[in-house]
Curated annotation (Swiss-Prot):
One Pfam entry name: RBFA
Compartments it resides in: Cytoplasm
Protein name: Ribosome-binding factor A
Keywords for this protein: Cytoplasm, Ribosome biogenesis
Quaternary structure and partners: Monomer. Binds 30S ribosomal subunits, but not 50S ribosomal subunits or 70S ribosomes.
Main location: cytoplasm
GO molecular function: ribosomal small subunit binding
């Protein structure tokens, strides 16, 4: 991944987070929503935006529907203040890395506690 794409990933992550905090008025998108990562494709036409909710994935489908419906708004607002040739289309994806990490830690703890002592 090029240095430019890495910088844009960080910039878009910060911008989308700020827009979620200050501009979006959708009740499905509350302050417990977290933008974990942005991954722009090499041709810079698409970007996966990985999000999670601190309360878990109970309303995952509603949240993703609201975010993907607002993807054009995010793209337009970020394009206004960013000078790049191609503004990627944002695709919001549920980030399972935190849940996977918690599950892995639980499994490790179970193995440690069930080992016979020498």
């Amino acid at each position: 991944m090029s240095r430019r794409i890495k910088k844009l990933n960080q910039l878009f992550r910060a911008d989308i987070s700020a827009l979620l905090q200050k501009e979006i008025r959708d009740p499905r998108l509350d302050t417990l929503l977290s933008v974990n990562e942005v991954d722009i494709s090499e041709d810079m036409r698409h970007a996966n935006v990985y999000v999670s909710h601190l309360a878990g994935d109970e309303h995952k489908d509603e949240i993703l529907a609201a975010l993907n419906a607002a993807a054009g708004f995010f793209r337009t607002e970020i394009a206004k203040k960013t000078d790049i040739r191609y503004m990627p289309v944002f695709h919001f994806v549920w980030d399972i890395t935190i849940e996977r990490g918690v599950r892995l830690n639980t499994l490790i703890d179970q193995v440690i506690h069930h080992q016979p002592e020498d």
